[in-house]
């Protein structure tokens, strides 16, 4: 049977950029990688209620720059920026270098695969019927302008004895088209019956200019936000 490759991994360098942006020699590479994993795990746990989608880690010489993409920046920043200062200290201790933290707001959380997946998982944990949770998420994404979306849940659905997989799709989700901008994420729902896996694919359109276009758009967005 044909197997599905990770849609983000296969598009790296084509229409997707890496979440860790640094270069290291053989001696330091594994340490940097392990630190990145620890930092991401720490931030995801600490900012559980802040709807964090992804954490981008850059390592200029002698310091580190972390960009947190979140749908609720107020929770990350805290009162008068107290929380983000504390966060900077804690992450600095983990990375053993001075850390600069940027917060980027996700304006359309219904078009972010990670947030959609965690939203569906949260509903499953609150015992919402899985079909209703999937349908609601799909409708919200299509309303926000997605070209296509597919949601898949797998496990003991509705407390069934035998685990199974169900999915729901609307619009186009062209996994073989490498220029297609497909956001993919997974999440786990921990229910009384066991773990239910949630997978989300969101197709946002085609990027004809390749990775250069993606980077140029990111740069323009950064300039706009810094003004």
Swiss-Prot record:
GO terms for molecular function: mRNA binding; rRNA binding; structural constituent of ribosome. The keyword RNA-binding applies. Keywords: Ribonucleoprotein, Ribosomal protein, RNA-binding, rRNA-binding. It comes from the Bacteria. Residues 39-107 form the KH type-2 domain. Pfam families: KH_2 (PF07650), Ribosomal_S3_C (PF00189). PROSITE patterns: KH_TYPE_2, RIBOSOMAL_S3. Belongs to the universal ribosomal protein uS3 family. NCBIfam families: rpsC_bact (TIGR01009). This is Small ribosomal subunit protein uS3.
């Amino acid at each position: 049977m044909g197997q599905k490759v990770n849609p983000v991994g296969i598009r790296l360098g084509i229409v997707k950029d890496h979440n860790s942006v640094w270069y290291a020699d053989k001696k330091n590479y594994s340490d940097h990688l392990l630190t990145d994993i620890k930092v991401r795990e720490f931030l995801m746990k600490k900012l559980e209620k802040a709807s964090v989608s992804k954490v981008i880690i850059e390592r200029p010489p002698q310091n580190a720059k972390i960009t947190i993409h979140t749908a609720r920046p107020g929770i990350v920043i805290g009162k008068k920026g107290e929380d983000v200062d504390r966060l900077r200290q804690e992450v600095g201790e983990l990375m053993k270098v001075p850390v600069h933290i940027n917060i980027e707001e996700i304006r359309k959380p219904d078009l972010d695969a990670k947030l959609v997946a965690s939203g569906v998982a949260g509903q499953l944990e609150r015992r919402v019927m899985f079909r209703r949770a999937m349908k609601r998420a799909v409708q919200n994404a299509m309303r926000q302008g997605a070209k296509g979306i597919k949601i898949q849940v797998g496990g003991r659905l509705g407390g069934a004895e035998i685990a199974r997989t169900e999915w729901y799709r609307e619009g186009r989700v062209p996994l073989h088209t490498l220029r297609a901008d497909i956001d993919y994420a997974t999440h786990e729902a921990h229910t009384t019956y066991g773990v239910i896996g949630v997978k989300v694919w969101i197709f946002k359109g085609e990027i004809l200019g390749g990775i250069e276009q993606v980077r140029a758009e990111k740069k323009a967005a950064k300039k706009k936000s810094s003004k």
